[in-house]
């Protein structure tokens, strides 16, 4: 039987329009890798599960667990918004293998919406190890107000880091001209694509049409 871990809510924050961050205690025996996800269950004792898979938005070195989500009227989201400091929840063991491939290639993140969640600990790790290679983040949202962690993303202390917010309400979407303008070499990069199914399909088509090697990009679907 898979182990279940007990959590307690520390705080709930609004981090963008219609977007909430939940910060929980982290059990001493809970371990995970950057880029993994878990199932967060916010049901009360005796209730059926009210759970959802969420990427872990905190770094393994932190003594908390952070999750971030768009608000909706689903049972899970409604319960999350009702939670108060000290309320309990549970999580499963972390799973997933969406992680770095370190090489001499530029790291390129192509992200939309709440797909930014696992990117935060990735950037924290690059900052921690004093990464010297080039890192470019292209982050697509309809407006600035919907851009989760915008201020934090501007302030990572990574030597060759470039943050490129894309506001599709007033700008063209991420396209090959933008990539060619911002990247040293589109063919000498490792791409990490996270977002909705439609966003992923668009980004994969963009890379395929420009003959980017399939081995040079990794995909994580946020539904």
Show where each model-derived region lies.
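Ferredoxin-reductase
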Residues: 2-85, 141-143, 170
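FNR/FR-type flavoprotein reductase catalytic core
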Residues: 3, 72-223
